[in-house]
């Protein structure tokens, strides 16, 4: 009986550790998505705009910051419309089957979706064949979204 309890405890610890070890599906630093940039501003202002700590919203275990009350309201009403693809990880990196951090100034909007890249140089690689990269990234994201960075 003691042996079965020990086996159960070991199994429980292993499973719990696996569950809690999973990384978040949103790229964030100190719990803040997009390095504190306003995701809506990419669409409305056509440029990255730093959000304010006082205008924030928790979504998918990350804090999203906004530059205006209007942008905050737009995001709350439809976060999937404004949140970057692949959880804000580098779109090019995901198309290469790995997660990479992003630079908020390296971005594109394609078919009303926001894509971020690791750097302006990586964005250049991304823009050489965006349709193919999106297809690859969509396929890989399903497999890697819950993996460690």
Specify the residue positions occupied by each region the protein language model found:
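Bacterial Sec-dependent N-terminal signal peptides
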Residues: 1-24
């Amino acid at each position: 009986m003691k042996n079965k309890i020990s086996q159960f405890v070991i199994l429980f610890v292993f499973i719990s550790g696996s569950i809690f070890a999973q990384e978040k599906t949103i790229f964030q630093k100190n719990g803040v998505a997009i390095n504190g940039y306003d995701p809506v501003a990419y669409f409305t202002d056509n440029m990255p705009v730093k959000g304010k700590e006082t205008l924030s919203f928790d979504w998918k275990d990350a804090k999203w910051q906004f530059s205006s009350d209007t942008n905050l309201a737009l995001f709350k009403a439809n976060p999937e419309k404004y949140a970057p693809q692949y959880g804000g990880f580098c779109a090019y990196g995901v198309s290469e089957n790995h997660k990479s951090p992003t630079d908020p100034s390296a971005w594109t909007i394609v078919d009303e979706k926001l894509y971020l890249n690791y750097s302006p140089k990586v964005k250049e690689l991304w823009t050489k064949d965006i349709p193919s990269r999106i297809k690859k990234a969509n396929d890989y994201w399903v497999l890697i979204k819950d993996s460690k960075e």
